[in-house]
Every structure is written in structure tokens, then in C-alpha cells.
Amino acid sequence: MIKKVDHIGIAVKSLDQTLPFYTEELKLPLLGIEEVESEKVKVAFLEAGETHIELLEPTSPESAIAKYIEKRGEGIHHIALGVDSIQGRLNELKEKGIRLIQEEAKIGAGGSKVAFLHPKSASGVLYELCEKKGEE
């Protein structure tokens, strides 16, 4: 079951250059910054009411975010939906013929379990399913 829009992921070239707009101009509280080595990104989470904004900076030219920025420029990368039982939800979607980028959840920022749906199954939108750590 989808519980909420967990966050909106935005690809950026530099957190140092981008963060002041969000924290000083928009006055969004910075919740934290962490590196997700497996994805070759550094992420910053900001609180925006009931949801969050995730800024993603590539740490390597080989990262998916670096390739995204090179092809499309900076901007909205994905919408993350908070779910219960991510693996069960992935199995249901696969059975219904929905294309998945990952058939098995992996560990993402903050220890959350995450997996992406293929944009070709969702009108061109990249959706991430996200199960927060401790909410299994």
C-alpha cells in the first residue's frame, strides 16, 4: 500500500552551490547529508512539510545521476512513494506486468529499502518505492 509521497529527488551538479537556495531562500530545514557509496552520490534531505526534497550530487562520472545530468541537465529525477512491505509490492507489480528497474529492494539513503519502477511503465515518470528503516 502506498502511504505517501516520501520525497522528490532532484539531480544537481553541486550540493554546495544548490543548498543555499533551498535553505536560505526557501527556508527549508536541512535534515542531513550523507554519501551513498553504492550509488556514487552524495544526498541532502530537506524538510518540505509532510514530505522531503532529496538533492542528489554525483560523486563519480559513472554514477546514474552524473549520466542523467549529462543527458537531461539538472532537475527533477524521481518521485519516491513510501510503501509498506516493499518486496511484496514489487512482486505484485511484476505479476501485473509492470516493468521494474530492480526486482529486489536494495539499501538506499538513511538505510531505507528502495527500488525503482521503469519510466516506460509510468508515462515517463521514474518512481522509487521506499520503505523506511524500521517500518518493515
Regions found by a protein language model. Name each.
Residues 1-39, 63:
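Long, hydrophobic N-terminal alpha-helical segment
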Residues 1-17, 74-83, 133-136:
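N-terminal beta-strand motif that seeds the catalytic metal site of vicinal oxygen chelate
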Residues 5, 12, 22, 46, ...:
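Short, structured motif recognition centered on aromatic/hydrophobic residues
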Residues 30, 36, 54-67, 100-116:
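Intrinsic, low-complexity N-terminal interaction/targeting segments
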Residues 36-52:
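C-terminal "cap" of GNAT-fold acetyltransferases
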Residues 44-45, 81, 90-136:
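Vicinal oxygen chelate
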Residues 69-95:
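Short, solvent-exposed interaction modules
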